[in-house]
């Protein structure tokens, strides 16, 4: 080993000793936030040093999910999103979806091909339910009408709650917008901070800029908010249920993601139409991607998660 290499190694060793590792075996199996790679040394990042040889989790082999979901697949999944009757006509494009996904490099790139395809299917299924324009006898069935809506329908309120960190801007409303129908000032604030956009003062960017709109949905998907894990960690196997989770019936699978998103309304109540609708989208998209569904698709017998920042607000 050369002199400078030895010096660099010693300095790195001192740094590592003087600070706590962030992820992997060095941190009790913790995964990195935002889908970042966990290096063999237990640090989070998105470069080859973190995602390459020895990477412990969320190891992105490529940031381009277009290899798994082509434009034609995307258009087939969201077949009727551009119907004249859909308020979101022309907004939700494949290019915006791919561009936004690249800002979250762990999405659709974590795990084996089956896991990666399931994550894409699960994300599009859950967001399709939130934006669906379908009905039971709709052309091509109810699960071909995802991404029809852009803004919350009816006469939504301001969705403003007192917040020292994310105070509401005068005249702004924080009702549901975009793929995940993000709501409330504090969620707009957190999402905006994560993607580098002031959404507290400019919430309608979620309904006028398609890339920003998709990014808010990916932010929600990739971000754990205690006591809830992230949707990403659940679908990719990065979440291990605690004893309390198991007692509550919360086992890894698509059903827990529904619990994360709207468990207080939909879960633990037996068979409810909303849960079945989400599953219907998921199965159709898995079929298009030619991947199996996995286990535990519903949350019929799951108790909802406890209080969290995103609980039942989206």
From Swiss-Prot:
InterPro entries: Chitin-bd_1, Chitin-binding_1_CS, Endochitinase-like_sf, Glyco_hydro_19, Glyco_hydro_19_cat, Lysozyme-like_dom_sf. Keywords: Carbohydrate metabolism, Chitin degradation, Chitin-binding, Disulfide bond, Glycosidase, Hydrolase, Plant defense, Polysaccharide degradation, Signal. Residues 1-20 form the signal peptide. GO terms for biological process: cell wall macromolecule catabolic process; chitin catabolic process; defense response to fungus; polysaccharide catabolic process. It catalyses: Random endo-hydrolysis of N-acetyl-beta-D-glucosaminide (1->4)-beta-linkages in chitin and chitodextrins. GO terms for molecular function: chitin binding; endochitinase activity. Disulfide bonds join 23-38, 32-44, 37-51, 55-59, 86-148, 160-168, 267-299. Transmembrane segments: none annotated. Residues 21-61 form the Chitin-binding type-1 domain. The active site is at residue 130. SMART domains: ChtBD1 (SM00270). Pfam families: Chitin_bind_1, Glyco_hydro_19. CDD domains: chitinase_GH19, ChtBD1_GH19_hevein. Defense against chitin-containing fungal pathogens. This is Basic endochitinase. It comes from Vitis vinifera (Grape).
